[in-house]
Design a protein with these regions (language model features):
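Extracytoplasmic juxtamembrane/flexible linker immediately downstream
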Residues: 1-20, 25, 141-152
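Beta-strand-connecting loop/turn residues
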Residues: 15-17, 57, 112
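Periplasmic OmpA-like peptidoglycan-binding domain that tethers envelope proteins to the cell wall
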Residues: 22, 29-40, 44, 55, ...
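Catalytic cores of peptidoglycan-degrading enzymes
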Residues: 51-54, 58
C-alpha cells in the first residue's frame, strides 16, 4: 500500500481503523451520477482488498455522494441508491482482489449524510468510499452478539411512545 499513501487517509476511531480513499490530485472515485469505479481507483481498492486478506476483523464499507441532488429525486433513483451502488461496486473490486465476501459485515449507502468536506458539499472528494476495519466490539454491536437489555426506565418511557405511534409487533 506504500505506493498509494498519498491517496489513503487512516484514522483510528472507537469502532476501528477508518480508511478513506481520496485521490492525491482531488479526482473523484466516481463520476457524477455514476457507480462505475474510476480506473485509477480500481488499483487502490484491489490493493486494499489484498491487504485486508491478512486481517481477521470484519469490514464495513460505506458509499458516499456529494450533496448535488440526483436526477429523479425523492420518488426515484436518488443519492441513497447511488451511494449504495457505489459501495457495492467497491465491494466487487475488493472481492476481485481475493478478499473473501464473508469478511464484509455491512455494505451501506450514506448519500451525502457524511461529507468529507462539509464546507464544500459539492466537492468531488465527497464522492468516495469509506472502509472500516472493525474492532471486535464494533462487530459484536453490529451483528447483535453483545446485546444488552434496555433498562426498565428506558423500556417504560419508550412503551407509550411506541404504542401511540401505532406500531405493532410482527
Amino acid at each position: 500500500l506504500a505506493e498509494f499513501k498519498a491517496q489513503i487517509r487512516l484514522e483510528i476511531t472507537p469502532d476501528g481503523l477508518q480508511i478513506q480513499i481520496v485521490d492525491d490530485q482531488n479526482r473523484p472515485m466516481f463520476d457524477v451520477g455514476s457507480a462505475l469505479v474510476k480506473v485509477y481507483m480500481r488499483d487502490i481498492l484491489r490493493e486494499i482488498g489484498s491487504a485486508l486478506n491478512g486481517v481477521e476483523n470484519k469490514i464495513s464499507l460505506d458509499g458516499h455522494t456529494d450533496a448535488s441532488p440526483y436526477g429523479s429525486g425523492e420518488r426515484g433513483y436518488s443519492n441513497w441508491e447511488l451511494s449504495s451502488d457505489r459501495a457495492n461496486a467497491s465491494r466487487r473490486e475488493l472481492v476481485a482482489a481475493g478478499m473473501p465476501d464473508d469478511k464484509l459485515a455491512r455494505v451501506t449507502g450514506m448519500a451525502s449524510s457524511y461529507l468529507l468536506e462539509p464546507q464544500n458539499p459539492l466537492s468531488p472528494v465527497n464522492r468516495r468510499i469509506s472502509i472500516l476495519v472493525m474492532t471486535r466490539e464494533a462487530e459484536e454491536r453490529l451483528l447483535g452478539r453483545a446485546r444488552t437489555p434496555l433498562d426498565a426506565t428506558t423500556q417504560t418511557a419508550a412503551a407509550p411512545a411506541i404504542a401511540a405511534s401505532g406500531a405493532t409487533k410482527r
